[in-house]
Amino acid sequence: MTPISAPAEPAAIPLRTGGVAGSSAPEAWFRQYGVPFTRNVSTATLTPFLPDPAKATGAAVIVAPGGGFLMLSMEAEGWAVARALAARGIAAFVLKYRVKPTPAGMADFEQAVSAMFASAGRSDSRMRPDDAVAGLANPIADARAAFALVRSRATEWKVDPARVGMIGFSAGAMTTMVTTLAAPDARPAFIAPIYGSMEAVKVPANAPPMFAVLAADDPLFAHKGFGLIDAWQTAGRPVEFHLYEKGGHGFGLGKKGTTSPGWFSAFVSWLDANGFLKPTQ
């Protein structure tokens, strides 16, 4: 992890959802795996990535990066995904949601991250969305504000308010799921948890269609069953699930040398097949 200067975010819109209790260290950026991350986020923002009006479908996706609620993978699981969606005519909005406070020093932060992933990777570790709701009030509030903002500016952004969904990666997948479970006013039209927890949930009535992705060699969530998929099926709600042989965890748009890059095109095809990409008239 190498500290870097904060990049310019001229299009970022403050969501005005408040700060983070107990946070004293400022927001800090660093580079890991060759891409930028941020941590100690105490002010939530939403950054629009709008498609060429000639290609716009009217669909929109709120994009929630992952990072264990200690950091956010802004490029690989945020901006890059948003650019790819916009290129397909889908308006994308990267949600920089509030995360837990971390030590100001990089060495102490790295130690905290290592401990978190070691705990999450235990075979007996269970990250149940139903149980996580109470501890994720900030990300849920940020996601709710994001949905409200997109719908309030739908005409300006050429978005159909009824076709606003959410995609999230790892912790962002958890944010997507707890928002679906605990924030009925968000009303995501569809959800896409990408390499998130596969634990079963109590599926809400009229739960949105779900597109889920996981790698069979994911060190955090593989080999722990597919309760989430089973729960959606049992509830009679639409679900599509892609399990890739290899990809590990945190592969973003896909890991080279594996079939995991196929998930993005499959997701867009799924949106189309479910009627979410009907072009705006």
Please provide the spans of the model-predicted regions.
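Serine-hydrolase catalytic machinery in alpha/beta-hydrolase-like enzymes
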Residues: 12, 19-45, 52-61, 66-157, ...
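Alpha/beta-hydrolase
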Residues: 64, 194, 244-247
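Hydrophobic alpha-helical packing residues
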Residues: 84-89, 228, 232, 271
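C-terminal catalytic histidine-bearing segment of alpha/beta-hydrolase fold enzymes
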Residues: 110, 233, 238-281
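Short beta-strand/loop motif that positions the catalytic acidic residue
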Residues: 212-214
